[in-house]
Amino acid sequence: GGIKPGVLGFTDEELQVLVSEAHHRGMRVACHARSAAAVKQAVRAGVNFIGHANYLDDEALALLEANRDHVFAGPAVAWEISFLEHYQSFGFETGSPEHEGYAAELKATQASVRRMRDAGVRVLVGGDYGLNITPHGTYARELQYFTDYFGFSPGEALQAATKHGGEAFMPDGRLGTLETGKIADMVIVKGNPLEQISLLQDADNIRAVIKDGQI
């Protein structure tokens, strides 16, 4: 059973009602959308955050670009990359359907993320954590994935995690950057992540965490 790949889980009318009702109640809407058809449906319905967006076609990219002022995308690649780094320890062989499937998906994701970035679509860090190979507390490694796999500079990866993440959660602009009058959420680190993004993965380099102005 289950839904076949490429088959949309909702009709356009169903999704539009869900999004409309959520927005009416002051909520923002996130969805999982891997195929180009799903991404296009989500953008047309007014979804705020699209998770994955692995397989974009030209029409899907054009829709994202046209709506880039109010839609965000997050590839959520930690699961894919972690699997590809450790698949043999899970009992899978090189060339197995699982290995080849995730490798192909990552290749498609790399192409889609680079296209979104070039089109000015805000691409976010995070997603699909809390699993055995993506435990909570390991989010910082995804910033390195953005530099290693998607061609982001360390500064661009940090911006995806902070400024753009803040804009996604609080469109009023109160979160995500260090400016007078904004929410004082920040991390003080030893070293310069603009020169070495991987230092954020070492807890010993985290000197202080400030939340709402409180250490």
Residue ranges and their predicted role:
Residues 1-107, 124, 129-131, 150-151, ...:
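Active-site core of metal-dependent hydrolases
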Residues 16, 62, 158-159, 198:
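Generic structural signal for individual residues within well-ordered alpha-helical segments
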Residues 24, 94-97, 107-192:
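His/Asp/Glu-enriched, well-ordered alpha-helical/loop segment
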Residues 42, 135-138, 198:
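Short glycine-biased active-site loop of nucleotidyltransferases that positions the nucleotide triphosphate
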Residues 193-199:
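Short, Lys/Arg- and Gly-enriched loop/turn segments at beta-strand edges
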Residues 209:
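Short aromatic-centered micro-motifs
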